Amino acid sequence: MLSFMKIRRNPTRPVTIGSITIGDGHPIAVQSMTATKTQNIDATVEQAEALHARGAGVVRIAVDSDKDAEALAEIRKQTQANLAVDLQENFRLAEKVAPHVDKIRYNPGHLYHHARELTWQEKVRYLIDTAGSNNCAVRIGVNCGSVDPAKKEKYDHDDSITPMLESALEHCELVDSLGFHNFVVSLKDSDPSKVVQVNTLFAEKRPDVALHLGVTEAGMPPDGIIKTRIAFEQLIGKGIGDTVRVSLTLPNPRKPEEIDAGKQIVEDIHAGRVRSVVKFDDSKLNIISCPSCSRVENEAFIDLAAKVKEMTTFAQEYSITIAVMGCRVNGPGETDDADLGLWCGPAKVNLKRGPEALGAFGYDEILPKLKQELDDLIAAKQ
């Protein structure tokens, strides 16, 4: 955690996450997420401890199965880090992991895949009851690539802000009505300007709710750090934000660099070293890529993201977005809005043009296919 020069902060409610408290004027906590396979207990403990030692206030771990939950119980015994669990579709795993973590993160857009006979309100009640009985904080994590489908259908396809905002506010209202207040909200997009917009709107309507800031799929450094800095400087500079994560596409041994980047940005803001006069140029090539986590099924994803960046330098002057995602959980949905999208499986990389699937190709075949599609896009723009 960081505490430097006094800056104005929104009067958010305090949220206790293990040994730290965020909100209510407490120092902004920097956090990260393990990228090792959760069932590889030794590797996950090693990475959690490395992040904790570097200054992570919270370390998040993905759990997608009963075996992951069993591994998490052992991981808890071997690390001093404050642990958050990342639940995707299988909300019922909350009961198995809650005794071993300090925070539960759920995504409102992922509550529709399991137990469809239950309403989303019933599922949230279950999550909140479980968190409360185990003294866990909760993060309501709204993401641009997996927004509540009922909310997306109400608005124009180009309006990604309103569905996210409505979903977050609706979930806050329900959780408050259940008498639970130890929660934080995140609203993330890969476009830093949208991150600023949606978090500003949320803070205007719910200045009492603590906010976790982040630019999702920010990509590789230094670009990913620049995108994140643009959003953080504008938000934290006006009092918005209680905890942050810098999501970077990095090899596993370099994950602690996310903590370094987050601490540096927050320290610079506190010291008045603001650089947002350098704006993110969305009229040029934009490559977004996820920061990797335990759901990545082939670590060649990291190398592929770097090769895509290198191969596409010739297209820098074109307004084209290419998304490179590491798993089948988030990849299919979070590449829909890109001009060209790649999401990686264990042996194949799935290529898309917008929401249209173009096929699955080997890791050694995908770059020529991507180059062909990119050439076609550029030709169409000329």
UniProtKB/Swiss-Prot annotation:
It holds the Pfam family GcpE. It catalyses: (2E)-4-hydroxy-3-methylbut-2-enyl diphosphate + oxidized [flavodoxin] + H2O + 2 H(+) = 2-C-methyl-D-erythritol 2,4-cyclic diphosphate + reduced [flavodoxin]. Its cofactor is [4Fe-4S] cluster. One of its GO terms (molecular function) is iron ion binding. Binds 1 [4Fe-4S] cluster. Pathway: Isoprenoid biosynthesis; isopentenyl diphosphate biosynthesis via DXP pathway; isopentenyl diphosphate from 1-deoxy-D-xylulose 5-phosphate: step 5/6. [4Fe-4S] cluster binds at C290, C293, C327, E334. Its EC number is 1.17.7.3. GO terms for biological process: isopentenyl diphosphate biosynthetic process, methylerythritol 4-phosphate pathway; terpenoid biosynthetic process. InterPro entries: Dihydropteroate_synth-like_sf, IspG_bac, IspG_bac-typ, NO2/SO3_Rdtase_4Fe4S_sf. Keywords: 4Fe-4S, Iron, Iron-sulfur, Isoprene biosynthesis, Metal-binding, Oxidoreductase. HAMAP family: IspG. Belongs to the IspG family. Converts 2C-methyl-D-erythritol 2,4-cyclodiphosphate (ME-2,4cPP) into 1-hydroxy-2-methyl-2-(E)-butenyl 4-diphosphate. This is 4-hydroxy-3-methylbut-2-en-1-yl diphosphate synthase (flavodoxin).
